[in-house]
């Protein structure tokens, strides 16, 4: 575990939160991207949750002609794996920080969209403490061949919600389906949702996420 805590936004749905959701944005966005989603979830009044929305570091991104932008990793194969491992360590540091603040790891959920979903899966499946769940939206599984050797027994029973757009032009739904099947092979519990949308989030998905979060945290 190394490095400073990532810059982030914190939103609390009530006093003295009893749970936390760490939600990772996609390529080129920042923590503000999912800030408007939090009130739309309309979580129960009795469920006080701290939402932590970190900003990815800025780095040179090959598909952006090397221009620096916020990204959890460069999709260049020669650099991507190292970036993903680095980002996973940074997210682990956020998880550990919530435990230091008094929350059980079983009250923590990792969530992510697109690139953020890759990091949520990369981190959560290998984390050495049991989590409340992993939420992976419009995303895929990085280097699934290594997962069988690296996954954490502590999180083998962690519920996973995956959701994807049928018309996603950025990360085709076939990649999400492939990730789901790889997780099934390792006996993970995956709930799968798909929607008539592109690379985005839709109202029905928000409602489904709300129900899933509530079921995991109450």
What are these regions (language model features)?
Residues 2-107:
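Serine-hydrolase catalytic machinery in alpha/beta-hydrolase-like enzymes
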Residues 19, 158-159:
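Alpha/beta-hydrolase fold active-site loops
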Residues 34-39, 172-182:
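Short alpha-helix in the alpha/beta-hydrolase fold that links the catalytic acid
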Residues 41-46, 151-157:
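Short, conserved loop/helix-junction motifs that constitute active-site signature segments
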Residues 55, 111, 135-138, 163, ...:
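Alpha/beta-hydrolase-fold catalytic nucleophile elbow
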Residues 104-153:
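Primarily recognizes the serine-hydrolase "nucleophile elbow" in alpha/beta-hydrolase
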Residues 160, 177-218:
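C-terminal catalytic histidine-bearing segment of alpha/beta-hydrolase fold enzymes
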Residues 162-164, 168:
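Short beta-strand/loop motif that positions the catalytic acidic residue
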